[in-house]
Amino acid sequence: MKASIRVKLETLVERYEEVQHLLGDPGVIGDQNKFRALSREYSQLEEVTQCFQAYEKVQEDLVAAQEMAQEDDAEMREMAQDEIKEAKEASERLTDELQVLLIPKDPNDERNCFLEIRAGAGGDEAGIFAGNLFRMYSRFAEKKGWRIEVMSSHASEQGGFKEMIAKVSGDGAYGILKFESGGHRVQRVPETESQGRVHTSACTIAVMAEIPEADLPEIKSSDLKIDTFRSSGAGGQHVNTTDSAIRITHLPTGTVVECQDERSQHKNKAKAMSVLAARIIQAEEARRAAVVSDTRRNLLGSGDRSDRIRTYNYPQSRVSDHRINLTIYRLNEVMEGDLAALIEPVVLEYQADQLAALAEQN
């Protein structure tokens, strides 16, 4: 193990012990925000600390086995060789695990997220495909034990959606789904196509981390324009006080969020504000991300909805991820929520890029 990496690990272990001590401090326990923040840091440090301690134990075992290999007794030497082999294999495995654990963590990865699906080019077929994608992600969430809740939706005339925003709640939801942001293209024969010709349509996906209330940006009420309208209508402001749908415009950025899925205007406003905050923060992070590596930008997307990341070809039962040149012929399984074969290779590529960057720093 490189000396620089060992120093980093020893520093993390020291911080782990410090946080462990702080969590028992009455002053910290009395401050719920500080206690939650330290608890989150403690859980993040615990895994790398335990892994490093296991690595150190293996190094001790290796030294002991190497000393035993110098014994006069042939049987002891043979036993020592077996232990040396096991220790070296364990050392290599733990070194790999530690390198992955040292990859800088995105603080948002463990959070819930908002999944936004918008129909793009392709007319009614794009709206139908948006509905297919929402069903696909709903099935995936179900397999992961996550909960998915519709925040806002605009149905299209022939089925599906013009736009759908859903909240996905569950451990690591954002960290897994963030790689889905970008353009999704479908190639298939629409049900309304009498000539049997393959049409190409598209949808765009945006995945935004849910921001905890304590971390929400300050949004001045003077920066907001709030309109109400009838949920069943196409929008527009009405005098009728029973109108429960909400449209919020953030004037400085021009960001617009609508929510009309709840009967309560208060609930719709609360939902819309949470999505608005996530969008504002995502836009700021996208600006900062302009300096990241090309690989990271390709995998996570630039924030531009036009970035095409995936094609779903129905005639060939093919799904292609254009970021890593991956093609699988399991379209039906994918549309039923079996996304692991698509997401995991992208995550591994992303980790490999970060490991390479870590190696350059050391």
Curated annotation (Swiss-Prot):
Residues annotated as carrying N5-methylglutamine in the record are: Q237
**Major location category of this protein:** cytoplasm
After translation, how is this protein modified? Methylated by PrmC. Methylation increases the termination efficiency of RF1.
* SUPFAM superfamilies according to UniProt: Release factor
Work out whether the entry's keyword set contains Cytoplasm: yes
- GO molecular function (one): translation release factor activity, codon specific
Keyword list, A-Z: Cytoplasm, Methylation, Protein biosynthesis
According to its UniProt entry, what is the function of this protein?
Answer: Peptide chain release factor 1 directs the termination of translation in response to the peptide chain termination codons UAG and UAA.
PANTHER family (alphabetical):
LD18447P
| UniProt-recorded name of the protein | Peptide chain release factor 1
Q: Please report the organism this UniProt entry assigns to the protein.
A: Aliivibrio salmonicida (strain LFI1238) (Vibrio salmonicida (strain LFI1238))
User: Gene encoding it?
Assistant: prfA
